[in-house]
């Protein structure tokens, strides 16, 4: 969620927000605890959600706890998401701030002073910037996605991943919301997704950029997927000394001689240095390192998982050699897995949309990306046939077209119409209303990016141009459109 000053529209790092958020939740009788980092509160944990920060104090994120699916599942998730949004908007008032309905702030600095001021002090960033040479500050202007997570059986994991990757152009076009950067039109409807070549292009290891490029072909199974991710030519990220899931904050070790993860796992031990104190250590390869490294790619979708029981590393490596071997092993180990969709830009109901499309469409904005992905994965065989019909390589080209032109491109619009048809067929009738926003965008040809550009161009030459966006494009409290 892109935080903006409620009077000027400027990018605005939060200060008192988390204390205020705890108070808002406690006043409703919700138990919560603060999440601390370097003696500063960077999040609030409740049973229903994790409310925290992405890479900067100017970019909030909320991750809801998993909910049971089935008929009405999206409505239940939508009610929770709107409750969390309401809490966020109320707490932001303490900082004189609001959420701007954009997937990237329209005019935010990215210089060294701003980066030092607003970047969250996570240990992982020392490795990414200081060792790997990422231009991490490219994303410090609050680039935001509406990440959607849908559980899938492990036997269908690779198929589901291929579906979401292959059909990403439709989600990019439907939920495009970042046409502006540094106070100027970028020529893209979804400029947010230009981030990866800019972050990785100057990086120390060419393999980092490889893991953000649309794959040359679909993945045959999970073994194929992880061979692609951990292959020679890539370089392992730093690895934990013990098994834990807070990968952005855990002490880790940078391996000497920069091996790929595949080479490290086949060695009994590897020398390296701790990222927190520089101490030389030996790291013994373990199945936890395979599980930990799942976040190492930056495509439009990831397979995310946890294993109830970690297998012995030799057993994992043996299973990895055989087609379907990881799927079978993970099932035995009690896998809990889902597809993380990363293509949709962040979007919220604002006054512009409410005035144009009405309350039913406004209420569906938060859930529409989830409805598209859930519908496709519930109808995965038809969705995979759609990928085959359109051709994998051609779909990769359309992804770039969707970033630039959105639904103005006839091919992207035709693909999107077919994607929504397949998704609709995969949803229970009770959840079909969650596609209302996606339907509206397709039928009108106007995404949030188009609506934002109309307002922006209409106030050209005004010194307070950012402030003039707020009446139409600040996220509305759900009370305004019947979301609560």
Language-model features: where?
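Hydrophobic faces of well-ordered beta-strands that scaffold small-molecule active sites
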Residues: 1, 62, 146-150, 335, ...
